[in-house]
């Protein structure tokens, strides 16, 4: 995972900060803002070098009115077709009335997407006055930023592909529909024929969800959706799909769209993802969700945004109420924690089945890498080979470290001369490590040392176009090579070692921002074969292979389809519980890295006991003496009486002991028993979080594992820098004073880095005596970064402030509850 401060435009967040201080209330609501008003910028502290994308001033407005999912839940899950169509129409009408009332008050809103099935909300491009009015208005749960989601795959091509080995005897997923929320699918692929419907295009206006070509390069077709479809239902001769009898409903929510560089990149906006989830639960769009897909796969990730209250998280919960299980990729940003991790959205939703990646290949290749600078040894260790070609003999190379980000093959050249020829190219892996390594190879490098992103062993070894060794090195080693260009890099001949299931080094860790365990489980996600045909180096036919948490999520989505056929009475909530509860722990990695462990479909299919919820989230614990209580409903889905023994697996000296209402339960067939679980903090601990696993073992049956977690500390100092460009100024909309706020934190830890976000940030105005005048702005679900906005000298109501002294206060609330951090700064209006 790459952690650095980047410069990126996120006008939405800035506008949320500037909204009420730039333009008086009552203006024309949806007109584009003037770009000369003031600073509008966001600079994040976390993230991989993905394509920079501006979302404009798009926001998601979540309303308090009932959605279809709310109505169905209130009816106990029982509703007729006519009921559901009526409720959807009522939700749309209530939304229309709300927008109409705003228009009559002079705030015109033109929604881009309207959501009524999974939640009641709409997205729109809003100006400052509209955001101000909505934040203050009853009937609005909140105004949230529209963010960007990217395919969670490390791209690879032909060589060494293998299958995940997930099967159920006599079960193929027949009769089960999987909604694939991704790029378009290449419907011409022969090994997908008969398994993929025409689908729905959310991004464009096509009649189906076919894969689109890059507007500036027709040869570059969207591939990610095709690869995911192949993993689930493909019928290739080398590696078949997990659920070959299932049907894919492709919903194109991502694709080639304009980026900030003036080029095109493949991505989705979160409002497009929401629109796709709306169609997943109501494919024909008639307002009745009885035709909902059983499974919705989201192999895209909104980086680091593991918020439990976001519109996307709410929509995933709504989809579950409508009986659609959402399977989501955890992310490819590597280890993090020990409390909050690197999991993205929508995987952070409490109702999503978040999936991490495991490397399940039988063997990998290691090489010894030694880096020397004079008499100093900077690195001496066995390193997994990531590239296609192992060295045939020991290579002695000088490093060539690139100081600037790599964006194309030209990055390796200076005025036509290669910067890396005959050397070991030291370069950031970027969003696509395989492509970066290929560019270095074309520039004549003899080896590639990738940093800033952990690459799974052999993960790009499937790319035959890379004819040199590719290794992943620590950031510290890369920085040392930047300082010492005369160092010597030695790469020894390889040796092959047998593999056991190991968590892929790129797979994101939790916890989510509500303290929930994420990912819930792991699945094979490295080097899996797809239906992408190609040619190997010897000219023989080969098939593409992909790696990433999206790959693992596709495997689990296929497994869920098999389970849905095998257990047709299981609803979405039960499917999730069966898959999570039956997994197998691997290695010694913490619960936050693997949840319950590696997918075991056979155990899930034969389970006699279902635990709801399958994950226990205690949230944030208080001080000494804190106690948290949760209840687990245990349902006997077998035909026999079950005697169940419950174990906490804890030692006696645990700092956060977990106690149970019963250690032994007897449950009749079809009956439900409740198990009380209490966690308490008995002494001060330095740890950021505590976690563990409950084990429920029926006599003569398969055990069920339930992970739990408690976040032990409330983060402090959520507001860092608070600066004002001018402390004395006249009111001006054209030349405002610039306020810069640094919100949230990124803390280095032994696990990697911990992302500490802000649930809500308020900007308030007070007079010279400290009396609160009112709220100027509110930003929700704030990721760590710098937020800049203009202070025009107008108050909360839009009126020009009188001459005098004022105080600007910034309050930032932590996720999971707690006391806000407050910083203030004084200024004077003259």
Regions from the language model: what does each represent?
Residues 197-199, 203-211, 219, 429-430, ...:
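Catalytic-core environment of secreted peptidases
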Residues 54, 71-73, 136, 166-200, ...:
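Subtilisin-like serine protease catalytic core
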Residues 32-152:
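Inhibitory N-terminal propeptides of secreted protease zymogens
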Residues 502-507, 601-638, 660-664, 679-684, ...:
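Beta-sheet-dominated interaction scaffolds and their linkers
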Residues 588-591, 602-616, 638-678, 720, ...:
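Surface-exposed binding patches on compact interaction domains or structured appendages
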Residues 33-53, 111-114, 123-135, 151-180, ...:
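N-terminal domain-start motif of subtilase-like serine proteases
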Residues 38, 291-295, 352-354, 466-483, ...:
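C-terminal subdomain of the subtilisin-like protease fold in secreted/lumenal serine endopeptidases
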Residues 235, 253-480, 513-516, 536-553:
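Substrate-binding/access-modulating region of protease and related hydrolase catalytic domains
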């Amino acid at each position: 995972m790459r952690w650095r401060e980047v410069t990126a435009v996120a006008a939405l967040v800035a506008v949320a900060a500037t909204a009420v201080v730039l333009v008086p209330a009552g203006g024309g609501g949806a007109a584009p803002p003037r770009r000369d008003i003031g600073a509008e910028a966001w600079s994040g502290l976390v993230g991989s070098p993905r394509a920079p994308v501006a979302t404009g001033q798009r926001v998601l407005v979540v309303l308090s009115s009932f959605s279809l999912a709310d109505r169905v839940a209130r009816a106990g899950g029982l509703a007729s077709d006519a009921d559901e169509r009526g409720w959807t129409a009522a939700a749309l009408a209530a939304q229309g009335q709300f927008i109409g009332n705003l228009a009559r008050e002079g705030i015109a809103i033109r929604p881009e997407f309207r959501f009524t099935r999974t939640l009641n909300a709409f997205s729109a491009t809003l100006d400052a006055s509209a955001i101000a009015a909505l934040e203050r208005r009853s009937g609005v749960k909140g105004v949230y930023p529209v963010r960007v989601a990217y395919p969670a795959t490390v791209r690879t091509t032909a060589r060494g592909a293998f299958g995940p080995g997930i099967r159920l005897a006599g079960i193929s997923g027949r009769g089960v529909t999987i909604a694939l929320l991704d790029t378009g699918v290449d419907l011409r692929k022969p090994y997908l024929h008969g398994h993929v419907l025409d689908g729905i295009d959310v991004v464009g206006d096509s009649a189906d969800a076919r894969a689109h070509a890059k507007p500036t390069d027709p040869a570059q077709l969207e591939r990610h959706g095709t690869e995911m479809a192949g993993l689930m239902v493909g019928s290739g001769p080398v590696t078949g799909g997990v659920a070959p009898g299932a049907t894919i409903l492709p919903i194109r929510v991502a694709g080639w769209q304009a980026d900030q560089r003036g080029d095109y990149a493949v991505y989705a906006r979160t409002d497009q993802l929401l629109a796709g989830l709306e169609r997943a639960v109501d494919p024909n769009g008639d307002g009745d969700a009885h035709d909902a897909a059983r499974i919705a796969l989201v192999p895209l990730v909104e980086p680091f945004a593991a918020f439990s209250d976001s519109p996307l998280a709410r929509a995933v919960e709504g989809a579950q109420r409508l009986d659609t299980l959402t399977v989501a990729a955890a992310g490819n940003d590597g280890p993090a924690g020990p409390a909050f991790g690197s999991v993205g959205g929508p995987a952070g939703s409490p109702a999503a089945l978040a999936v991490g990646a495991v490397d399940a290949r039988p063997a990998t290749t290691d090489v010894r890498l030694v880096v020397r600078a004079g008499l100093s040894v900077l690195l001496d260790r066995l390193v997994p080979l990531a590239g296609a070609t192992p060295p045939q003999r020991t290579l002695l190379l000088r490093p060539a470290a690139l100081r600037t980000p790599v964006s194309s093959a030209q990055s390796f050249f200076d005025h036509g001369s290669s910067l890396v020829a005959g050397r070991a190219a030291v370069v950031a892996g970027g969003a696509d490590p395989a492509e970066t390594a290929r560019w270095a190879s074309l520039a004549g490098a003899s080896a590639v040392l990738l940093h800033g992103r952990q690459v799974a062993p052999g993960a790009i070894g499937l790319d035959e176009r890379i004819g040199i060794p590719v290794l992943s090195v620590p950031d510290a080693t890369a920085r040392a090579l930047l300082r010492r260009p005369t160092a010597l890099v030695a790469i020894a001949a390889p040796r092959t070692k047998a593999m056991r299931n190991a968590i892929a080094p790129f797979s994101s860790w939790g916890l989510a921002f509500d303290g929930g365990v994420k990912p819930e489980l792991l699945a094979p996600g490295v080097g899996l074969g797809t239906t992408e045909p190609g040619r190997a180096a010897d000219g023989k036919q080969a098939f593409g292979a992909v790696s990433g948490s999206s790959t693992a999520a596709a495997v689990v989505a296929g497994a869920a389809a098999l389970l849905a056929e095998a257990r047709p009475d299981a609803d979405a909530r039960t499917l999730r519980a069966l898959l999570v509860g039956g997994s197998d722990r691997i290695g010694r990695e913490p619960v936050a890295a693997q949840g319950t462990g590696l997918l075991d479909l056979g155990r899930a299919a034969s389970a006699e006991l279902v635990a709801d919820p399958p994950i226990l989230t205690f949230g944030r614990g208080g001080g000494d003496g804190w106690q948290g209580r949760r209840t687990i409903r245990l349902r006997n889905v077998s035909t026999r009486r079950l005697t169940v023994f419950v174990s906490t697996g804890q030692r006696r000296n645990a700092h956060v002991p977990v106690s149970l209402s019963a250690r032994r339960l007897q449950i009749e067939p079809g009956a439900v028993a409740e198990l009380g679980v209490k966690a308490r903090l008995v002494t001060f601990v330095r740890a950021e979080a505590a976690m563990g696993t409950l084990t429920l073992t029926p006599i003569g049956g398969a055990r069920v594992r339930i992970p739990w977690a408690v976040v032990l500390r409330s983060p402090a100092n959520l507001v860092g820098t608070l600066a004002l460009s001018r402390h004395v100024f006249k009111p001006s909309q054209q030349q405002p004073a610039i306020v810069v706020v640094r919100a949230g934190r990124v803390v280095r830890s032994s696990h990697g880095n911990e992302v500490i976000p802000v649930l809500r940030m308020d900007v308030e105005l007070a007079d010279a005596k400290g009396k609160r005048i009112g709220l100027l702005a509110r930003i929700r679900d704030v990721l760590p970064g710098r937020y800049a906005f203009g202070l025009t000298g107008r108050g909360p109501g839009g009126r020009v402030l009188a001459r005098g002294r004022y105080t600007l206060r910034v309050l930032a609330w932590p996720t999971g509850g707690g006391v806000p951090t407050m910083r203030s700064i004084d200024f004077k209006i003259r």
